[in-house]
Structures are given as C-alpha cells and as structure tokens.
Swiss-Prot record:
Pfam families per record: TPR_19
Cysteine-cysteine disulfides: none
Homology family: Belongs to the TTC9 family.
UniProt entry tagged with the keyword Repeat: yes
Keywords of the record: Repeat, TPR repeat
Gene responsible for this protein: Ttc9c
Each TPR repeat, start to end: 8-41, 72-107, 108-141
Superkingdom of this protein's organism: Eukaryota
PROSITE patterns in UniProt: TPR (PS50005), TPR_REGION (PS50293)
Name of protein: Tetratricopeptide repeat protein 9C
Length: 171
C-alpha cells in the first residue's frame, strides 16, 4: 500500500516536470498513471470489482491524507493540461475541476478552470457562479476577471435576445 502511494507520488512529480516542459500529453499520461496506482485504495470510493481478491489493511489517517492530496493534485493538474491541448476537451476540464472542488471547495485554480469550461460549454450561469467564486479568492487575477467579463457579456446578450423574442411573441 505504501509502495503504491510512493509510485503515485512519483508519477505525479513526473507529470509536473512534463507540464513545466510543455509536454502536456506526457503529463496527462503520468497523472493518469498516478491515479491508477491509487485505484482501489480510496475507502470513500466503491471498489470497481467488489469481493474480488483479499481486502487490504485500512489506510492510516496519514496515508488517507496523502492519497487524497495526490488525487486532488492530479485532477487539478489534468484540468490545467487539458486547457493547454488542442482541441480542448472542456467536458473533461469541467469534470476534473469539479472533482477537485468536491475536496477543496475554495481552490481558486479549480474554480477558475471550472468557470472556463462552463463558459466554453455555453453554460454561462454556471460559468458566472464559478468565476465569481474565483474572483473573490483571486481579485487581481487578470484571466479570471477577463473570463468573468466575457461571461457577463454573453449573459447580457442572451437576456437581450430573450427579451426581444418575448416582445415579438406578445406584440
């Protein structure tokens, strides 16, 4: 069990190095490998194949903390990588960012990435929700502010069109 945690940590660190080098596909591969090492160790998740094989000893609180930290970091880093790759898979960015936010609801980077994903998926209400939360945590971040402005603009445009549509229906 300790070995799997160490291997997962090593894969995560390799992924971080690949990310710094701009090798996003390689980084994604390393983060996925790290998560695979952790599969079945997380007591909060159901086992993929119940009642198969011996049940390992329970994780200590320290091991569980390490496991959750590695998982959260990997999901956050996966979202960052995917935003750098073409074509961007916004559904995955949203999914990974939300996994981070389940454990760390205040994580500014995950809030921002979720907002960006929802924006590009044209769910502007959700984008606004996440970007407002991100701007509250990082008020000086120009990217967060820019995406919040773009989202507000799209929402205003949508509401203007909606208003004109209803005026046309009842005129």
């Amino acid at each position: 069990m300790e070995k799997r945690l160490q291997e997962a940590q090593l894969y995560k660190e390799e992924g971080n190095q690949r990310y710094r080098e701009g090798k996003y596909r390689d980084a994604v591969s390393r983060y996925h490998r790290a998560l695979l090492q952790l599969r079945g160790l997380d007591p909060s998740l159901p086992s993929p194949i119940p009642n198969l094989g011996p049940q390992g000893p329970a994780l200590t609180p320290e091991q569980e903390n390490i496991l959750h930290t590695i998982q959260t970091d990997c999901y956050n880093n996966l979202a960052a990588c995917l935003l750098q790759m073409e074509p961007v898979k916004y559904e995955r960015v949203r999914e990974y960012s939300q996994k981070v936010l389940e454990r760390q609801p205040e994580n500014a980077k995950a809030l921002y990435r979720a907002g960006v994903a929802f924006f590009h998926l044209q769910d502007y209400d959700q984008a606004r929700h996440y970007l407002l939360a991100a701007v509250n945590r990082q008020p000086k971040d120009a990217n967060v502010r820019r995406y919040l402005q773009l989202t507000q603009s799209e929402l205003s445009s949508y509401h203007r069109k909606e208003k004109q549509l209803y005026l046309g229906m009842f005129a």
